[in-house]
Swiss-Prot record:
<dbReference type="GO" id="GO:0009279">
    <property type="term" value="C:cell outer membrane"/>
</dbReference>
<dbReference type="InterPro" id="IPR011990">
    <property type="entry name" value="TPR-like_helical_dom_sf"/>
</dbReference>
<comment type="subunit">
    <text>Part of the Bam complex.</text>
</comment>
<comment type="similarity">
    <text>Belongs to the BamD family.</text>
</comment>
<dbReference type="GO" id="GO:0043165">
    <property type="term" value="P:Gram-negative-bacterium-type cell outer membrane assembly"/>
</dbReference>
<comment type="function">
    <text>Part of the outer membrane protein assembly complex, which is involved in assembly and insertion of beta-barrel proteins into the outer membrane.</text>
</comment>
<dbReference type="Pfam" id="PF13525">
    <property type="entry name" value="YfiO"/>
</dbReference>
<feature type="signal peptide">
    <location>
        <begin position="1"/>
        <end position="22"/>
    </location>
</feature>
<keyword id="KW-0998">Cell outer membrane</keyword>
<dbReference type="GO" id="GO:0051205">
    <property type="term" value="P:protein insertion into membrane"/>
</dbReference>
<protein>
    <recommendedName>
        <fullName>Outer membrane protein assembly factor BamD</fullName>
    </recommendedName>
</protein>
<dbReference type="InterPro" id="IPR039565">
    <property type="entry name" value="BamD-like"/>
</dbReference>
<keyword id="KW-0472">Membrane</keyword>
<keyword id="KW-0732">Signal</keyword>
<dbReference type="InterPro" id="IPR017689">
    <property type="entry name" value="BamD"/>
</dbReference>
Amino acid sequence: MKKKNSIIFVFMILFFNSTVQSQSFKKNYFTERYTLYEKSNKELRKENFDNAISILEKIKKNNNTANISNDKIQIDLIYAYYKILNFDQARKNIEEFMYFYPNHPNIDYVVYIQCLISMSLDKNRFFSVFPINYYKNDYFYAKNAFFQLKYFIYQYPKSRYVVNAKKNLIYIKNRLSEHDLSILKFYFFHKEYIAVINRGEEMLQRYSETPSARKALIYIEKSYYALKIFDTAKKISKIILLNKIQ
């Protein structure tokens, strides 16, 4: 009986020691992790984005995905990757964040960064070095930014970023309407008057408040005259006169 009690006692001591060690390990793990996270924040404040990313990726790699702080780590990574223009990694983290945290209180920030990335990609830094009008280049990312910004403004009307989003949408609308106007002029030069009218009407529907859309009216008017559709041409002439479009 004594021997049996001794075995139980030894087992209890071993179990207690292992529990204490386990708790100590967990405490050290979270302390180390918190220290690293604080260090990454300091690097972000100093704008040492590469250093911050290195630390944050280390935390993310060794972190339990169920941990409550993972959202903060991912938001910081999105910001840091965006700032160093590593848009592929930024978008990868955005997609992960939106999948795991669709109802997060800062989801509007993440979606807004997504809009800014599309705008940055559209600006095409390579062509900005040369005397080339980037409006004539491919505008895939501009269209992305247009729809993303419209979605953002509709989905998050009370967001702190909505004012800037509206300003950016005006910029993108001007960008796209100027691009469409250059295409419209090409059609007009080649006497494709139906195409001019169709393109112009699309511009007026999407970007009616832009200068380029108003200029499109001049080419629409000339196209109707060229097609000998005089009644419509005269109506457009009156609109041009009233709005003082040149």
